[in-house]
């Protein structure tokens, strides 16, 4: 991928506009998880140290365009940034028309960009106003790279220079390493409740990987496709033919979708529901499958240990309940100890990484949800495509 990297530019005295992804959870005016802010700080601090006049904006929540409300304010985010920098940071409420000055080496935060009219629909007039504020536009929000909006795509068309930030560059390099030229064997783990929401990902990965591990509710549809009884488990019966096709298609080229030989069941979805281990052939009509059993988990751990590349998106069981979390724990630990390159992404996956404390043992953790999935699907990310276009002049 050929794009300009912010680290390649001389930024001294330049007006730099950074689009970051600081869409963090806020409760009672306080940020409850600052991971995305921390991830964005490297680009911000790099530009400040370089002596640039630094402006950063992000979206937060889902505000109504043209109507600013206090709960949509980036103030809680600014409080965290100020604390990290150890200095006061200005928050500029009305900024699209300019009218504010930034000193060399200073950072100002521009209020929630999704409040601006024309932002979501990528209106040129809005994008041109943004571009007029800067000499260099830096896209650092991989989490919104799959959306063409005025602050992620439009501004990149009109800014004098458009570059990728440190975080975005790292994300794209990691994705390219895992998907464009993966070390073999390549294993993908795709979990989640529904095949329908991950169908395009499953189809795209089924053509690339050596083993496609399915987990969660998705796995039940594949179990059913193999003629197993899944009882009252979450299962999309209308997608059984699709699951069969994927199994056959992969087998035809010597690849596989490993199917569980043992499962952990309960009768209802409840934190206190007792876990019952069964062979995959012995599931009763009133059972619900909530996890894979130890034999299946060990089989996956052995596959992961031999992998050159591991792409991980989603748990293999209801790991938020400990009695149904052993499968996900075994898989997580196998990934943590695997010598291969591991790339993980998605909210549930990150929750599992945090729960089992393997943050520093996964090669690369993507901060993005939707964009990560769309990249896995092989889709063009508009915010990245425009950076490549601009780099070619």
Curated annotation (Swiss-Prot):
Substrate binds at residues 21-23, 36, 59-62, 114, 147. The keyword Transferase applies. Keywords: ATP-binding, Cytoplasm, Glycolysis, Kinase, Nucleotide-binding, Transferase. One of its GO terms (biological process) is gluconeogenesis. Pathway: Carbohydrate degradation; glycolysis; pyruvate from D-glyceraldehyde 3-phosphate: step 2/5. This is Phosphoglycerate kinase. The lineage of its organism: Bacteria, Pseudomonadati, Pseudomonadota, Betaproteobacteria, Nitrosomonadales. GO terms for cellular component: cytosol. SUPFAM superfamilies: Phosphoglycerate kinase. Its EC number is 2.7.2.3. Monomer. Belongs to the phosphoglycerate kinase family. It catalyses: (2R)-3-phosphoglycerate + ATP = (2R)-3-phospho-glyceroyl phosphate + ADP. HAMAP family: Phosphoglyc_kinase (MF_00145). It is found in: Cytoplasm. GO terms for molecular function: ADP binding; ATP binding; phosphoglycerate kinase activity. Pfam families: PGK. It comes from the Bacteria. ATP binds at residues 198, 320, 346-349.
């Amino acid at each position: 991928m050929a794009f300009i990297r912010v680290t390649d530019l001389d930024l001294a005295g330049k007006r730099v506009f950074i689009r970051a992804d600081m869409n963090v959870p806020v409760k009672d005016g306080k940020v409850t998880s600052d991971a995305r802010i921390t991830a964005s700080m490297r680009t911000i601090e790099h530009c400040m140290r370089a002596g640039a006049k630094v402006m950063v904006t992000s979206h937060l929540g889902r505000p109504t365009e043209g109507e600013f409300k206090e709960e949509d304010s980036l103030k809680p985010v600014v409080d965290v940034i100020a604390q990290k920098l150890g200095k006061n940071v200005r928050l500029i409420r009305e900024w699209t028309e300019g009218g504010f000055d930034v000193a060399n080496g200073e950072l100002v935060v521009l209020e929630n960009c999704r409040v601006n009219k024309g932002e979501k629909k990528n209106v040129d007039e809005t994008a041109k106003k943004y571009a007029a504020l800067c000499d260099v536009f830096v896209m650092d929000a991989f989490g919104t790279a799959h959306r063409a909006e005025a602050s992620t795509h439009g501004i990149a068309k009109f800014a004098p220079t458009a570059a990728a930030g440190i975080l975005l560059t790292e994300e794209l390099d990691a994705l390219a390493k895992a998907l464009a030229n993966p070390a073999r064997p390549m294993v993908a783990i795709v979990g989640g409740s529904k095949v329908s929401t991950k169908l395009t990902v499953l189809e795209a990965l089924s053509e690339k990987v050596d083993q496609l591990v399915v987990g969660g509710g998705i796995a039940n549809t594949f179990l059913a496709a193999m003629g197993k009884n899944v009882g009252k488990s979450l299962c999309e019966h209308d997608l059984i033919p699709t699951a069969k096709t994927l199994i056959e298609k992969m087998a035809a080229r010597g690849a596989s979708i490993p199917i569980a030989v043992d499962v952990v069941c309960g009768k209802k979805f409840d934190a206190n529901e007792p876990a019952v281990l069964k062979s995959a052939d012995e599931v009763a009509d009133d059972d619900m499958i909530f996890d894979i059993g130890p034999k299946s988990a060990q089989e996956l751990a052995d596959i992961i240990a031999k992998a050159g590349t591991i792409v991980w998106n989603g748990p293999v069981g209801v790991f938020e309940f400990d009695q149904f979390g052993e499968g996900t724990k075994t898989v997580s630990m196998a990934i943590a100890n695997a010598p291969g390159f591991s790339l993980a992404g998605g909210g549930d996956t990150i929750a599992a990484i945090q729960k089992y404390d393997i943050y520093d043992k996964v090669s690369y953790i993507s901060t993005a949800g939707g964009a990560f999935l769309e990249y896995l699907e092989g889709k063009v990310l508009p915010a990245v495509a425009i950076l490549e276009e601009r780099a070619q002049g």
